[in-house]
């Protein structure tokens, strides 16, 4: 079983439902080895949580040998990339976790196609690298291999 570290944020005095996130992680096939809840005064545009908090998560992740960090909020593509630069584990936000769960449990062809479409729509703004470079260079989709 994959080891998950859960990260949630208390914003504007509203406490997160960490138990729900734990259940989602279990449904995805993992085991929760730790959790961090941060009180946020404001959302950091670069990391969502603060940089110091991200470094704290990285240290906690290494101590617990967690392979995945699940954030109980939606991360923008740049926030995910920035967190990946600090935290030595796979970064998953709430939406991706839920899409992964649906993917595992879809049985009909229609269901599988709908989940795949949702996953691709989620991943599209997060694509960086050679494929995007080639698309801009040539102007066609035929050179992109995902």
Where are these regions (language model features)?
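Short alpha-helix plus adjacent loop in nuclease-associated cores
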Residues: 97-115
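Short alpha-helical scaffolding segments that buttress acidic/His motifs in well-ordered protein cores
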Residues: 102, 137-138
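Amphipathic alpha-helical coiled-coil segments
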Residues: 113-120, 124-127
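N-terminal accessory targeting/assembly segments
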Residues: 1-100
């Amino acid at each position: 079983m994959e080891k998950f570290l859960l990260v949630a944020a208390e914003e504007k005095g509203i406490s997160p439902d960490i138990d729900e996130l734990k259940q989602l992680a279990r449904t995805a096939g993992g085991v929760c080895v730790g959790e961090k809840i941060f009180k946020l005064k404001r959302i950091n545009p670069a990391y969502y949580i603060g940089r110091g908090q991200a470094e704290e998560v990285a240290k906690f992740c290494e101590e617990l040998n967690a392979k995945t960090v699940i954030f109980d909020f939606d991360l923008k593509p740049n926030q995910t990339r920035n967190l990946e630069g600090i935290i030595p584990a796979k970064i998953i936000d709430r939406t991706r976790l839920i899409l992964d769960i649906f993917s595992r449990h879809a049985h009909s062809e229609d269901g599988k196609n709908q989940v795949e479409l949702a996953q691709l729509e989620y991943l599209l703004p997060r694509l960086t690298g050679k494929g995007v470079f080639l698309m801009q260079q040539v102007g066609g989709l035929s050179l992109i291999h995902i």
